[in-house]
Amino acid sequence: MNTRPQFRPVLWILALALVLTACQTETAGDEEAAEADAPTETASVESETIAWDYTGETGPANWAELNETYEACAGSRQSPIDLVADDEAQDVNVEFDYTEAEGTLFDTGHGVQVNIEGGTLRIDGKAFALKQFHFHTPSEHTVDGTSYPAEVHLVHASDDGELAVLGIFYEEGEANDFLAPVWEDLESRATMAAADPLMMNAADMLPADRTTYTYPGSLTTPPCSEIVRWHVMQEPLTMSAEQMEALTAIYDDNNRPVQPLNDREIDRVTL
């Protein structure tokens, strides 16, 4: 069984605003103004000026009530979710066409992000351009109720405004060679802001096993728009204890709790 979810079309202008922050939204103020010229860091006016957080009165339980533009946060197709799929993995036509490109470390105000436009993800022939990847600690998605220490989201956008997000879990283990040069500038938020661009290829991030959980969902932060094709990889990658500590020292507990599955189906597919 591989049910193809139908996604509502959205205006490209809105989609661009969403994709460039995807599951991470920037804070307003000096950081935002300083990075205004970077296309992958543009956020909607509402997301920039309306405060939200992961705890307290502006935390996930209240996001939908903070502003009418966040009403989707109380929707029926929200992310993240607990991933459970009993059926055999099926083949689906997904192609990774990543290229080496310049990546820029960026502090969103809610997490660590790397802005990069380096290739595409093709799903059933439809192209989704890579825009950025960012980290959540601990993981947002869970598998059979179990979370991982970290999760990265690779955010892609199509020309018509649909989003495809590829999620990869991390567990503690061997040092991650791909992340090593990025982590050199992860000592503090100040060193992140001063970091030089790095050449990288997102293909080097992918695990060997391309089996994924896929389902229709949403952004995991306000405005929680339900326009995302989620593909969360089954096989986790590793970070060393030192790498994990460096990440959580900057941002920790920046994960939205799992949301109800409702009437959606989770498919397990081989890419």
Predicted regions and their residues:
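Alpha-carbonic anhydrase
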Residues: R4-F7, W12, C23-L271
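Anion-recognition interface
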Residues: M1
